[in-house]
């Protein structure tokens, strides 16, 4: 098994560089089913890059994340948390990374994730505001 960096995962979707896309696809095929590990940071960077650099819409980002999570070639870090984060991301205002880290934290036994992020605070019961100083 090998792990994939975000740029390799992105190249598999990118038609602007056919040579790198072909190399990334060949690498994944050569590893076989479950032979490529994608960790939580790569998933977050992937979603962020699609949104910020590629200017993709939330629906397309969600579809691409879902395709990664369901592809048999990939072993995903924290797959249950990633799936729950994706479900929240589809309908919520926060970034995928916010939901994913909060789901990981919840699985670790944390009641909430403290944040200053207003979108995350509006998003769900996974987050709580950092209290004001008295």
Question: What would you call each of these model-derived segments?
Answer:
Residues 4, 37-38, 76, 96, ...:
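Short beta-strand scaffold positions
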Residues 1-38, 53-60, 66, 133-134:
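Short, well-structured N-terminal submotif of metal-dependent ribonuclease cores
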Residues 11-13, 49, 123-124:
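Residues that scaffold the ATP/ADP-binding catalytic core of kinase and kinase-like folds
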Residues 8, 42, 81, 100-101, ...:
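Alpha-helix capping/helix-boundary segments
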Residues 1, 102-134:
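Acidic, PIN/NYN-like endoribonuclease modules and their adjacent C-terminal/linker elements
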Residues 65-91:
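Acidic catalytic patch
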Residues 33-36, 73, 107-112:
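Short active-site oxyanion
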Residues 47-51, 66, 86, 102:
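Amphipathic alpha-helical segments within well-ordered protein domains
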């Amino acid at each position: 098994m090998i792990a994939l960096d975000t740029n390799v995962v992105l190249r598999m979707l990118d038609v602007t560089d056919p040579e790198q896309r072909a190399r990334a696809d060949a690498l994944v095929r050569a590893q076989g089913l479950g032979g490529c590990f994608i960790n939580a940071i790569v998933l977050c960077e992937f979603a962020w890059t699609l949104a910020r650099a590629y200017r993709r819409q939330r629906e397309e980002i969600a579809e691409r994340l879902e395709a990664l999570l369901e592809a048999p070639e990939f072993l995903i870090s924290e797959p249950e948390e990633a799936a729950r984060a994706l479900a929240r991301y589809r309908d919520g205002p926060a970034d995928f990374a916010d939901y994913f880290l909060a789901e990981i934290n919840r699985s670790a036994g944390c009641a909430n994730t403290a944040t200053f992020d207003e979108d995350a605070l509006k998003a769900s019961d996974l987050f709580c505001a950092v209290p004001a100083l008295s």
